[in-house]
């Protein structure tokens, strides 16, 4: 691995480590997303805590955290594998941020950015899948999980297995991070889109 590739991966991780949910809630003088609602510093919890505007800002920044480094890797290296690894590092930064004690979000919004950066078709697959599941079930977590699996595995059909591997690893990590959501979906206790923030319960 040359210096350029290494620098891009480090940049992706560090950018991913900037937790927009925590910063946005601080700016809007809202409770910390780590102590209210689900306890997850992500877009869905910010929506429950502060409404649409803070949530939209959080979502946009989290998407850009994935999009920007992947596009940079794509343009500067022209190497699909390095670009896919850049996506993985951005996700790792978001989920395990060095700036916030390695305790971050669940990576879904950042994944959207990486997918659009890697291939707009993959990004579109994610968004369409998420919307379809969300409209039918009103479960944000279920929508994210289904869209993550379908979009990540779709890379296999557009690239070779080596390039797809980082995205498959991302899917596994996101599934593991949603373990609590999966358990509540099975038990019927998972929060739905539009529910207000309650005591910390580790939902999406």
Swiss-Prot record:
It catalyses: an acyl phosphate + sn-glycerol 3-phosphate = a 1-acyl-sn-glycero-3-phosphate + phosphate. GO terms for biological process: phospholipid biosynthetic process. The keyword Lipid metabolism applies. Belongs to the PlsY family. It comes from the Bacteria. The chain crosses the membrane at residues 8-28, 53-73, 81-101, 116-136, 155-175. Keywords: Cell inner membrane, Cell membrane, Lipid biosynthesis, Lipid metabolism, Membrane, Phospholipid biosynthesis, Phospholipid metabolism, Transferase, Transmembrane, Transmembrane helix. Catalyzes the transfer of an acyl group from acyl-phosphate (acyl-PO(4)) to glycerol-3-phosphate (G3P) to form lysophosphatidic acid (LPA). This enzyme utilizes acyl-phosphate as fatty acyl donor, but not acyl-CoA or acyl-ACP. Pathway: Lipid metabolism; phospholipid metabolism. Signal peptide: none annotated. GO terms for cellular component: plasma membrane. It is a multi-pass membrane protein. InterPro entries: G3P_acylTferase_PlsY. This is Glycerol-3-phosphate acyltransferase. One of its GO terms (molecular function) is acyl-phosphate glycerol-3-phosphate acyltransferase activity. Its main location: membrane. It is found in: Cell inner membrane. It comes from Francisella tularensis subsp. novicida (strain U112). It is an enzyme of class 2 (transferase). Probably interacts with PlsX.
